[in-house]
Amino acid sequence: MGAAAAEAPLRLPAAPPLAFCCYTSVLLLFAFSLPGSRASNQPPGGGGGSGGDCPGGKGKSINCSELNVRESDVRVCDESSCKYGGVCKEDGDGLKCACQFQCHTNYIPVCGSNGDTYQNECFLRRAACKHQKEITVIARGPCYSDNGSGSGEGEEEGSGAEVHRKHSKCGPCKYKAECDEDAENVGCVCNIDCSGYSFNPVCASDGSSYNNPCFVREASCIKQEQIDIRHLGHCTDTDDTSLLGKKDDGLQYRPDVKDASDQREDVYIGNHMPCPENLNGYCIHGKCEFIYSTQKASCRCESGYTGQHCEKTDFSILYVVPSRQKLTHVLIAAIIGAVQIAIIVAIVMCITRKCPKNNRGRRQKQNLGHFTSDTSSRMV
């Protein structure tokens, strides 16, 4: 019985019926002959050829090649689509309009035809190129006669008169302040949040000490006046003394806009200039700077020094307290570093433990070989 079963031929599975194969082939042919499958196999735009017709709606048809040309024309950068000083430059497979303006930071404000105040005329031209809209200079100086805040490169909000009526209830809100017209007492509101900044005390031009530079900006916004940072660290008793004196009328000279007759390029509000030669050596470990808006000199101390003349050593700079956001990154980096160190230590320990075992095994084998040779010689 076992031999007969072993010699029995293997039986292959029965072939599918002929009718099943015919039905399957018919269904496949019918599926490929549907209009949807034909449309999916054709290239976009229909026709399949370069000169085919594309449906144009309402029974009309247009040439697909003409449609492709029209679509490509939209992406062409030329003089009509890149005006006001723009230059067409290659950007990957296409062209884009680039506004390459190297504007200086001198504060020579101008009022644009869109009602925005720009830092200087170069920023105005750059805004016109960026938005591809004509913006002209309608007045030298800010758009407000009382020196509104102005934007370095603001958005278009209509004409200057419309902007003036829009903020007429609050007046000009400077130093990132916003007008709150819905409040009972309409005025400028400051929404500067300094909660996420670390402790880094500074001395400001108003003679007050602040926990960090963000609070200086907040105070400038609340008081609506220019407040600059003199130096790092707390203010001292001599920080309120003006080095260059005052004008003849006894009032501190705080110009808001550069005089047209003054042609010096380094005269602008809110920036620092090098100190005159008579103040050489004023800063011991730092750089002397003259604040034109306050007519006072200040020192920008080097790292590790503080004081009015940068004569004191600041040991607090060695202990930097990171902010909340940076603290999480520091913790993650510390954990990753600890894991890497642990892996390296584990690998080194495994290698150092494995090597002595191998040496011991080799020594035992050598000793065993000597022992067998000695015993064999004795037996002989």
From Swiss-Prot:
Membrane topology, Cytoplasmic segments: 352-380
Alphabetized SUPFAM superfamilies for the sequence: EGF/Laminin, Kazal-type serine protease inhibitors
Highest taxon, organism lineage: Eukaryota
Span of domain EGF-like: 271-311
Domain Kazal-like, first and last residues per copy: 98-145, 189-237
UniProt disease annotation: Encephalopathy, acute, infection-induced, herpes-specific (IIAE). A rare complication of human herpesvirus 1 (HHV-1) infection, occurring in only a small minority of HHV-1 infected individuals. It is characterized by hemorrhagic necrosis of parts of the temporal and frontal lobes. Onset is over several days and involves fever, headache, seizures, stupor, and often coma, frequently with a fatal outcome. Disease susceptibility is associated with variants affecting the gene represented in this entry.
Name of the featured protein: Tomoregulin-1
